[in-house]
Structures are given as C-alpha cells and as structure tokens.
C-alpha cells in the first residue's frame, strides 16, 4: 500500500508577487487556473489543503465555497501576501487575523494551518512562530534549503514540533506542528528542493520522482505544493518578473498529473487527524 502524502495549493493570483497596491492593475486568472487544478484533483481522486490568501477569499468567496464543498481543506496564506521578514509583528498579526476571519466566515470552519508567502520564515523572522502558535495547529513555511530567496539549510527535513524561539530545534512541549517542504539530501551538496512549484517545472521528472519515492521508502511522508500559475501556459507577461516565473509552463500540467498518479495524497488536516 502506498504511503499517504500531503498535497497543497498556494491559492493566489499570478500577480501576487507584486506589491499589493499594484494588484488592481491586472486582470485575475485565479478562477480559471484554480478550476483546472480542482478538475485534476477530481480526476485523480486527490484531496488537498489550499493555503488561501484572504484577499482571494474576499474577492472570490464562491471559489472558496466550491473548494470546501469538494472536500478540500482551506488554510491561511496571509491576507496580502506579506513577506514576513519585511514587516513588524503588529502588521503581520493584523494581516493574519484578517485572513483567518475572512476564510472562517466563508467556510464556517476553523482555519487550522498557515503557510508564509515566499516561505518567509527564516532566521530573520523566527519571531513569527510564537504568533502562529496562537492561531494554528500546524505551519508549513520552513524550507530546509538555502536559496537566494528563502530557506533554512539546517532545519529538520521531517515533520516536527518547533521551539518557538529557535524553530530549527524540536520542542515536544509545543502544540504547533511544523511540516517542512520536501527535499532530497545529496552528500557534499546538501538538500535539494523537490517539493513542487518552480521545482516541478525546472527539475527533470525522473529526479523529482526518485527523490520523493526515496522519502516514502524511508517510511516518511512529504508535502507537495503547487501554485495555480504553475499550470498556466498563457500567464500574462509582467515586466518585473524574471525567467523563473515562466520557465517550462507548457509542460507543467503533464508533470503535475504524473505526480498525482505516482503518489497518494490527502489534506494536511486528514493526515494529522485533527
């Protein structure tokens, strides 16, 4: 029997990497791209956790209701796609509360989990963990790699309870569960990200499959993630965006379907039995 893993979607629009005040300049594509993902999940009998921007919930409440009605889980991805490393504690918590209030009002269910935009919990923003522990049962923001954009290379690679002052240290007394993004460890080189998103588009499929299978062979589960824009071969060009936003979009849907076929997935809530 295949090991159950966790599937997640970071539910945001293609322009959400831009400053919030510029978002109104762009035409939304999130309904089209999210429905594509929902249909792929239905076809492959997959349930997922949708880390949802409060902004998206505010603009498209019927989309959130549809996701919820199909048996998927709604979790928080903040309200305005904040980089936690660049804001104050007060601004972060206010944004977080706004997101949770919007999503809980739409679904009528408690929001149990969070993922930081840009995976922006690292050594500059460890303070955020204490705030997260007040609102959530789990977090999935830590990426145990080191890239120019994010990551904590020496963080645990498997699910754990993080110390709230230094979350790369485990602390069994903490109620918050951390679910790090999937990596493959290569001697000398270190951890290679294989969790989805850009890496789904960039890495050869055979290597991603190999790395994820290796996790399951060790009797561990992994979490995978996708953005709606990752499957949008017609994503509009944005001048501020670099090559990695558009790389290999034409082949991404086919690769994602292979992931859905080759592994078993469920929601984080169902996996954790919470």
Feature locations, PLM:
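Histidine-centered divalent metal-coordination motifs
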Residues: 10, 77, 81, 227
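Metal-dependent polysaccharide deacetylase catalytic core of the NodB/CE4 family, i.e.
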Residues: 16, 44-125, 136, 141-148, ...
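Short glycine-enriched, charge-decorated loop/helix-capping segments at active-site entrances
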Residues: 21-27, 90, 239-245
């Amino acid at each position: 029997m295949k090991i159950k893993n966790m599937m997640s979607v970071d539910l945001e629009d293609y322009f959400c990497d831009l400053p919030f005040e510029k978002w109104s300049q762009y035409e939304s594509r999130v309904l089209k791209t999210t429905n594509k993902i929902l249909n792929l999940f239905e076809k492959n009998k997959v349930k997922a956790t949708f880390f949802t921007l409060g902004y998206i919930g505010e603009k498209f409440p019927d989309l959130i209701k549809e996701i919820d009605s199909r048996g998927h889980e709604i979790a928080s991805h903040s309200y305005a796609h904040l980089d936690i490393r660049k804001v104050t504690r007060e601004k972060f918590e206010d944004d977080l509360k706004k997101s949770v209030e919007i999503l809980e009002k739409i679904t009528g269910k408690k929001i149990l989990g969070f993922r930081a935009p840009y995976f922006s919990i690292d050594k500059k923003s460890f303070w955020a963990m204490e705030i997260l522990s007040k609102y959530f049962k789990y977090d999935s923001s830590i990426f145990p790699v080191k890239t120019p954009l994010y990551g904590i290379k020496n963080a645990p690679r498997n699910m754990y309870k993080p110390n709230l002052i230094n979350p790369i240290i485990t602390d069994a007394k903490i109620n918050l569960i951390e679910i790090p993004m999937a990596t493959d460890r290569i001697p000398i080189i270190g951890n290679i990200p294989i969790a989805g998103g850009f890496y789904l588009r960039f890495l050869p499929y055979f290597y991603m499959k190999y790395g994820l299978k290796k996790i399951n062979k060790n009797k561990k589960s992994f979490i995978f993630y996708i953005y709606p824009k990752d499957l949008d071969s017609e994503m509009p060009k944005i001048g501020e965006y670099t090559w990695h936003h558009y790389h290999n979009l034409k082949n991404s849907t086919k690769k994602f379907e292979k992931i859905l076929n080759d592994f078993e997935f469920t929601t984080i809530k169902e996996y954790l039995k919470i």
